[in-house]
Amino acid sequence: MKKVAVIGTGVIGNGWITRFLANGCEVVAHDPAPGAKERTIQAIENAWESVEQLGLKEGASKDSLTFVDSIEEAVKDADLIQESVPERYELKHGVLKEIDRFAHSNTIIGSSTSGIKPTDLQIGLNHPERLVVAHPFNPVYLLPLVEIVGGEATTKEITNRASVYYESLQMKPMVIEKEIEGFVADRLMEALWREALHLVNDGIATTEEVDKAITYGAGLRWAQMGPFMTFHLAGGNAGMRHMLEQFGPALKLPWTKLEAPELTDELKERVIQGCETHANDRSVEELEKKRNEFLVKLIDLVEDYWP
Amino acid sequence: MKKVAVIGTGVIGNGWITRFLANGCEVVAHDPAPGAKERTIQAIENAWESVEQLGLKEGASKDSLTFVDSIEEAVKDADLIQESVPERYELKHGVLKEIDRFAHSNTIIGSSTSGIKPTDLQIGLNHPERLVVAHPFNPVYLLPLVEIVGGEATTKEITNRASVYYESLQMKPMVIEKEIEGFVADRLMEALWREALHLVNDGIATTEEVDKAITYGAGLRWAQMGPFMTFHLAGGNAGMRHMLEQFGPALKLPWTKLEAPELTDELKERVIQGCETHANDRSVEELEKKRNEFLVKLIDLVEDYWP
């Protein structure tokens, strides 16, 4: 992959451009908004020091960027196309149809959509099979996660190829097999976000207090582990098995506006086995030691950089 | 504050003991379980290197710990009492009544409960006014957050005094004025947790994938900022105002099992004003610069410590 087209240059599109440039790609961008090019150049300028610190690939240059006046011109020779126009179905779908019309038939089109199902985006395309969702996280040039979701027309070969592409951009692709609105990461984030809005709406906490409740608590742990391994470590030596016994009943309590699933034996086993497999023979004590070393450094880091 | 009583020595109680010792307190502990003392000594041993790295207070010593055989003996001369018995109302309430009976009438009792309302815990106490929830986060000896929640009988003077106590333990106390089940931090965590269980239950993602979706994405940002400031920075120069325009409509979409509140003009303004006040005249660009410096270091740190 050498030449990448980026369609739509808002915060996300510009984040992609920076990542592509930092990884030695040649980028052709298109956005019809007045002043788009200048804003993109400024955005790259602001981000460049950070990507340099993380490490540039050979041949990486801020100058390998061209702005063109049409989608056709942007996509016609591209090896990968990244669509990042605003999150409105009609707009996105129209742009994707135009991309599809002018791109090589086997060029992968990645859509940055946060939650629209790829099957819905594939409707009416000439080559729907090469469209995947490739959903990144802000700031795109730093955060490694990208969710790869195929639609009904997408083949396994395409999601695999897409996964390899994005991995070559120093990302952590996560292929999601079952297509649902919001995919995986945004479902988790959106649950937290909606609960946070309820807390503010009900006058329980200010936005600053909600942020404080995360940054000085769970947020520190989630940087290293997600919710499952975090709870595995909170369960003492018996890990998640003990945790579910201890806090399973809380799933029935009004601790959030979100109804929990029934904690069946099957779900319990799935969660416990998942954590134990992930722990991979490392005892809770061993994992705790690693976590503690990490947290000590992270707490120092947070002190230096926030508020 | 010099002498602290800790009642209940599971993962949380032992975390408290370590924090108290690291901050130069003398600790008297009680737990009727066989082998409790040995487990506590081991837990302190495992954690001590980390608290040393974060910095011990003058006079801090692992040896300033005594185990005693009764609640009476533990609490009678204490300046602060921390209750951390298992999360079952009847058990906690019984223990708190016994603590209340033997403690000095003006000694603050902090309950580590994750979600039981302090008003419910105060029922039948001789001096209910000095009972507050002081809810910590695992690992208690490292994570700074502690939620302070008073019940109906609690005076403002007591929550203030409690707040000063916990702050002197190098913690970040957050006083929550409105008493609700789950308080603030656990409501947020529980929303994420329940959504995560739904994803696993519905076969959308494995526990490992859920964890990956957090650790390589939002988790990195949440270590430094909570959900509100994170979105403020994702909104470009117009910050949260733009973000709500862009992603407000997504609140109606099935991106989580949790119903969102109505995004009224009042709620919008509350959220926007909250973020702008917190940003405190720092532009989004300025905050982004700080965030990027932080993320570069954090990403390096995560590489070193996980998996």
From Swiss-Prot, chains A, B:
Primary subcellular site in the record, as a coarse category: cytoplasm
Swiss-Prot/TrEMBL catalytic activity: carnitine + NAD(+) = 3-dehydrocarnitine + NADH + H(+)
GO annotation, cellular component aspect: cytoplasm
Compartment(s) of residence: Cytoplasm
This enzyme's EC code(s): 1.1.1.108
Pathway this chain belongs to: Amine and polyamine metabolism; carnitine metabolism
Group of enzyme by EC: oxidoreductase
Organism, as annotated: Oceanobacillus iheyensis (strain DSM 14371 / CIP 107618 / JCM 11309 / KCTC 3954 / HTE831)
Role according to the record: Catalyzes the NAD(+)-dependent oxidation of L-carnitine to 3-dehydrocarnitine.
Any one GO BP annotation for this protein: catabolic process
Keywords: Cytoplasm, NAD, Oxidoreductase
Cited HAMAP family: L_carnitine_dehydrog
Binding positions (NAD(+)): G8, T9, G10, V11, I12, G13
Name this protein carries in UniProt: L-carnitine dehydrogenase
